[in-house]
Regions:
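C-terminal regulatory/interaction module of P-loop NTP-utilizing enzymes
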Residues: 1-266
Length: 266
């Protein structure tokens, strides 16, 4: 569906929400790459302001020179503007209100009006729906202005990839890292995907408070490429969790991977 929006070359802002590490940003990047669309990504933080987004004066060789921000660049080039982690923004994001309506923007500091070029549109990603994080999972996210949120016609609720899709993602990562997907590696990928799927189902049922993301699985593959040991890769990438969670996740993995104990030093 996102590809259809981007392929239409219409101005149609899209808000994508979902759990951390489930491929929201990657999906936008892939869609633009497949459609040969230019993508300009802006990582939003609570400190992001008009100067970061729209632009401002910079000191160059002793003179003040206007420098366009990424939003203006996207406007002029008809690119897809990605506001990544937009729910971390403060109310300074409201400088984009007129642009969010598909209109241009008047740069009062230089007295110039910028019109959007054909193909320009906006995609925003967030872990929340712009209403803050009630459970505290995403500390730092903010309640976004309702008028700002209302300027997004549609919202995609992105889930984690299916096991089949996730397996393809890990295979692609293996290819990128020059890891031959031979029999033992192929089994390793299956175990990882099945493991993550079980953890997520348990999370949704309220049985646990943590989750294994697609990004975490990619981290494990990268760790395996560096250290050459599957079990070490799994354990090191679980160290970010508290001891109880780490132990329960590891116990579940060992139940799936029957070779774990005997190959623990391999």
């Amino acid at each position: 569906n996102l590809k259809k929006v981007i392929a239409s070359r219409s101005f149609y802002p899209v808000f994508i929400t979902g759990m951390s590490g489930n491929g929201k940003t990657f999906g936008v990047e892939q869609a633009c790459a497949q459609l040969n669309r230019e993508l300009i990504r802006v990582n939003i933080t609570v400190e992001t302001d008009e100067d970061d987004l729209i632009g401002g004066f910079r000191l160059v060789n002793g003179e003040t020179v206007w420098h366009n921000g990424p939003v203006i660049e996207a406007l002029q080039r008809g690119a897809v503007l990605l506001l990544d982690e937009v729910d971390l923004a403060s109310n300074k994001i409201l400088c984009l209100q007129s642009i969010m309506e598909g209109k241009g923007i008047f740069l009062k500091k230089i007295g110039e009006y910028i019109k959007p070029a054909a193909g320009f549109t906006i995609v925003a990603t967030a872990n929340t729906k712009g209403k803050g994080s009630d459970d505290g999972r995403f500390i730092g996210t903010n309640v976004l202005n309702e008028a700002f949120l209302e300027r997004f016609p549609i919202t995609f609720e992105q889930e984690y990839p299916t096991p089949a899709t996730e397996n393809k993602i890990l295979r692609a990562m293996c290819a990128e890292l020059n890891i031959p997907v031979v029999h033992d590696v192929e089994k390793f990928l299956v175990y990882l995907v099945d493991w993550a799927d079980i953890v997520r189902k348990t999370f949704r049922d309220g049985g646990i408070d943590e989750i294994i993301s697609t990004r975490r699985l990619v981290h494990i593959i990268k760790a395996y490429a560096i250290f050459g040991k599957k079990q070490l890769a799994v354990e090191m990438c679980l160290n970010r969790f508290d001891e109880e969670t780490k132990t329960s996740f590891l116990q579940l993995y060992t139940k799936l991977d029957g070779d774990y104990e005997e190959n623990v030093n391999n």
